[in-house]
Amino acid sequence: MEEFQRYIELDRSWQHNFFYPLIFQEYIYGFAYDHGLNKSILLENAGHKKYSLLIVKRLITRMYQQNHLILSANHSNQNDFFGHKHKKNLYYQIISEGFAVIVEIPFSLLLISSLGAKEKKIVKSHNLRSIHSIFPFFEDKFLHLNYVLKILIPYPIHLEILVQTLRYWVKDASSLHLLRFFLYEYRNWNSLITPQKYISIFSKKNQRLFLFLYNFHVCEYESIFVFLCNQSSHLRSTSFGALLERIYFYGKLEYLVKVKTFTKDFRLILWLFKDPFLHYVRYRGKSILASKGTSLLMYKWKYYLINFWQCHFSLWSQPRRIYINRLSKHSLDFMSFFSSVRLNSSVVRSQMVENSFLIDNPIKKFDTVVRIIPLVGSLAKAKFCNVLGHPVSKSAWTDLLDSDIIDRFGRICRNLSHYYSGSSRKKSLYRIKYILRLSCARTLARKHKSTVRAFLKRLGSEFLEEFFTEEEKVLSLILPRNFSISRGLYRGPLWYLDIICIHDLANDE
């Protein structure tokens, strides 16, 4: 067992780094251990829950035996990759699931060690699982910041770069060779990491491996922030030379001049980027870097990020993937919300003997607004309304029971209201509710071959009214009694800490 320990042995310094398990938070939700290969086969003793490295090595050997069969079939019939087309997807699925299980182990052990060392702090960090926890953070921090960088994370243009960066985390050469063979032989590998092509065959049938590779790539991209903030790398060697060695290894010859310049001015770079008011947030392929500094500092960040992508990932990054916005003048489009910092005037009258004064105090307020046009477009695409937002019947659901139709519409309405509850302006939510409510009525009327007016007159509108006001009933239980909700939904922003992903209709990416 000791000879295999080095393959997934973690540096002890990692155990004190609590940041990286949080980076892989989204990746943890994506893994389904009970799908495909059972997690129990990786346990040496299920009672003690210890990973058996010997069993892991046997899995690698077993997959290599399967790999030999694939190669034999390939040589026997060049036109048919596996010899039998109906077995093609099955073999790919087995290899991808097996490899995903193997490469997950080091990161799982890293997470477990971090959770054990930070057990008391983890209890307070459960709410970080919710993506809504980002917006209270914005409300608290963005009022004191000036500029924000909106970054679209680039995806790797060549899979060899992805495999080579992975080798610094996973030291098992055999499994990496297997991954390289699997990726290069797969017919649809060009759309592996592209965010806009989630519907590809690979991402549908190999979600476990797809999520791991994409989140690993994002983690590698985020390593530059951790390195510059801590002045040390997350690699096994904490010296800056380790990062430079990797840049030299990946960078093409024409980029080495820039890398040397980066090395020469490294101390100056650390001084420039040592900003105590720098904040970083990411969700999927979009990230935000906000700072209290000047526009010059943000332009330097943009310059060094572009050079880092070009040198480290050997790709050309378009400057348009990074936008610099001033918070006081521009809205931030993030996670299906328009967020901005606006000034509210507070006029105070001051009376002094015979004279009175009016004092105007500007107060900053963080404002979040629903992106109504893309949301209506998503509803139109789902056949709930037309492109102008006029409700239409959902013809595909007319064969369902009345209770099922109402339940489906009600669930969508509640989920959207639940997600957009943090909006500062509720008028857009009322419009979405109106579209779904009338679409439900039109669907029921079409099913019963009647008009909407006659249908509602016969059954009454209360059956829909009571159903769609369930959100108000929930709010009456969780809000203090001094909040009056008899006039309608609570108008202030309300963030829920149980939302881990964007609703499909709200996600227009």
Curated annotation (Swiss-Prot):
It holds the Pfam family Intron_maturas2. It is found in: Plastid, Chloroplast. One of its GO terms (biological process) is RNA splicing. InterPro entries: Domain_X (IPR024937), Maturase_MatK (IPR002866), Maturase_MatK_N (IPR024942). It comes from the Eukaryota. GO terms for molecular function: RNA binding. GO terms for cellular component: chloroplast. Keywords: Chloroplast, mRNA processing, Plastid, RNA-binding, tRNA processing. Usually encoded in the trnK tRNA gene intron. Probably assists in splicing its own and other chloroplast group II introns. Belongs to the intron maturase 2 family. MatK subfamily. This is Maturase K. It comes from Opuntia quimilo (Cactus). The gene is matK.
